[in-house]
Amino acid sequence: TSGTTADPKGVVLTHRNYTANVEQSLSRIDIPSSYRTLIILPLDHCFAHVVGFYIMIACGASVATVQIGATPMETLKNIPQNIREVKPNFLLSVPALAKNFRKNIETSIRAKGPFTERLFDFALRTAYIYNQDGYHKGKGWRILLAPVVGLFDLVLFRKVREAFGGSLEFFVGGGALLDSELQRFFYAIGIPMFQGYGLSEATPVISTNSPKYHWHKFGSSGKLLEPLALKI
């Protein structure tokens, strides 16, 4: 980690560090044993270990990894096919990966012609208004937009989600600050990207937004895990 002092260094993480962070993480997210995930991120970091592997193991859920190709580029090309095969319920993401997903979605929409592209843009803008900052989704007069957003979800956004296997409910984002615009985009298409915050020294999760109890807001790093004390 380059963590708190900017000089890269090794961090000693004990077995109990890991099991404690698993217990803490499960205070903010529920993982049914039927859940599946596909690990796309590098396997040599504690974020992928805790949120990708260990909380799934603790809950009896299923984990898959990307099929290794003959070259790094071939491995990357396996990701879309592996997502469709595994049909994950959630995925781990970092900003660079989220941007790439969005770029591919927009390229696919653009290929369907100008009418579909304009309709998709209008649907996005409508969903942005309805969702506001996530936490205040559909509040006040915005409730009137619910039928329109529901229709757009049925005819447009659901088809986008099918490219992710059709079962994807949310992303868990970490590694760096996730742009609020990216959060708005994925929230609009029905796959919220829940930003978290952590440090390698903390094994690593400290706080996160969550689908549980509607604990999420764009631009926020969410609620502290429990039990955990934080000093600034």
Predicted regions and their residues:
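Adenylate-forming
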Residues: G10, N21-S25, N100-I105, L182-R184, ...
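Conserved AMP-binding A3 loop
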Residues: S2-V22
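Short aromatic/basic micro-patch
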Residues: V12, L92, L224
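Alpha-helix/helix-capping structural signal
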Residues: R16, A96, A176-L177
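Conserved AMP-binding/adenylate-forming
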Residues: Y128, L145-I232
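Conserved AMP-binding/adenylation subdomain of ANL enzymes
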Residues: T19-R36, L43-A146, G150-F157
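Conserved S/T- and glycine-rich ATP-binding loop of Class I adenylate-forming
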Residues: T1-T4, T37, P42, L91, ...
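Short, surface-exposed connector motifs at secondary-structure boundaries
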Residues: T5-D7, S34-R36, E162-E169
